[in-house]
């Protein structure tokens, strides 16, 4: 499947298919030099898939740390200095091969190297079906996740579904959180459909039907980011579950998707408090437990600590913490939430796990 962005200009293709990696070679010839920034774990499993590409004299491989460990100032400087030592021009490509963190990091390198060079995303996880599309790139600060970054469109996204075959179950769980988030944004019928399809751990682990829902998720995100690239309006909806989730992820060092799922449950509780919504919290807890999410992290949450991270969230403004909330399916809002309500919701969340 080939999707295409529909901005007024500077559009890019998104290839979603088995064997999509073959498209990389069609781009290599266009650049003076290319640097493949590859996650160390992906390199262990799939190094041979890039042998043909690396046979080009102008293509270099840079192995970077896996996951969020790569999104540091130190790794950023080291990578830039290595690339600059090759006397690059602006007709250079940075090719990100890995999960969401790899794409974030490599994209920020591309955005800032010589004030911007070509950037190709080659996501290798389910989670990265979300982050590879839309142009958000960045690294982390001691104050929180993704606080240093840019909006920078890729030249192409090449999503080879063959990479998913070797994903450990923890990464499947983490990635499914973003697939599920897109279903929630689409509405009640889509949410019910995906819950009925991936109804237990065994089916989710098999990845049966995942191709379809990944493509749907990308289409959902494209509709939103093309309408609001710089996150002034509806693009904020894509942060569903992320305000609380990012804080939990950063403080408890758990997988991104696991934290987002906790954040999704939390926002349902906040919506119930603020709007008298009628979200069935136990339903979502039961569903996520059946899939195998380790929700016991919730019992260890200290609100005051999490709240400090929430205050650093880049979506906030002078009025304080902003959250995306599903009032009812089809009615999504971005709302300022006071500290008392946030604490009350956290206390309620923990009562489900006593």
Swiss-Prot record:
Any one of the GO BP annotations: aromatic amino acid family biosynthetic process
Full protein name: 3-dehydroquinate synthase
UniProt gene name: aroB
Similarity remark: Belongs to the sugar phosphate cyclases superfamily. Dehydroquinate synthase family.
Binding site for Zn(2+): 178, 242, 256
Binding site for NAD(+): 100-104, 124-125, 136, 145, 163-166
Top-level class of the enzyme under EC nomenclature: lyase
Record keywords, A-Z: Amino-acid biosynthesis, Aromatic amino acid biosynthesis, Cobalt, Cytoplasm, Lyase, Metal-binding, NAD, Nucleotide-binding, Zinc
């Amino acid at each position: 499947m080939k999707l295409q962005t529909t901005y007024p200009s500077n559009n890019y293709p998104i290839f979603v298919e088995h064997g999509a990696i073959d498209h990389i070679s069609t781009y290599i010839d266009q650049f003076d030099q290319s640097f493949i920034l590859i996650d160390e774990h992906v390199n262990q499993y799939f190094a041979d898939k890039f042998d043909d590409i690396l046979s080009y004299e102008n293509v270099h491989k840079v192995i970077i740390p896996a996951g969020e460990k790569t999104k540091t100032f130190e790794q950023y400087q080291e990578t830039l200095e290595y690339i600059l030592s090759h006397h690059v021009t602006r007709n250079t490509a940075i090719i990100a091969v890995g999960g969401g963190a790899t794409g974030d990091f490599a994209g920020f390198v591309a955005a800032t190297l010589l004030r911007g060079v070509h950037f190709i995303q080659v996501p290798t996880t389910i989670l990265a079906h979300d982050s590879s599309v839309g142009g958000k790139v960045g690294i982390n600060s001691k104050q929180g996740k993704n606080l240093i970054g840019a909006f920078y469109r890729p030249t192409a996204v090449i999503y080879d579904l063959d990479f998913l075959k070797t994903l450990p179950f923890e990464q499947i769980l983490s990635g499914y959180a973003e697939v599920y988030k897109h279903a929630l944004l689409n509405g009640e019928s889509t949410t019910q459909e995906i819950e009925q399809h991936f109804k237990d751990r065994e089916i989710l682990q098999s990845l049966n039907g995942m191709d379809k829902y990944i493509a749907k998720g990308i289409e959902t995100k494209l509709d939103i980011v093309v309408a609001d690239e710089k996150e002034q309006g509806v693009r904020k909806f894509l942060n569903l579950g992320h305000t609380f989730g990012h804080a939990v992820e950063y403080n408890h060092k758990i997988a991104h998707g696991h934290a987002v799922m906790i954040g999704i449950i939390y926002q349902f509780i906040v919506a119930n408090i603020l709007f008298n919504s009628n979200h069935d919290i136990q339903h979502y807890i039961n569903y996520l437990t059946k899939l195998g999410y380790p929700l016991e992290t919730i019992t260890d949450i200290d609100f005051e600590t999490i709240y400090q991270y929430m205050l650093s969230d880049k979506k906030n403004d002078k009025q304080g913490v902003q959250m995306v909330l599903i009032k009812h399916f089809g009615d999504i809002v971005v709302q300022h939430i006071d500290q008392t309500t946030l604490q009350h919701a956290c206390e309620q969340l923990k009562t489900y796990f006593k």
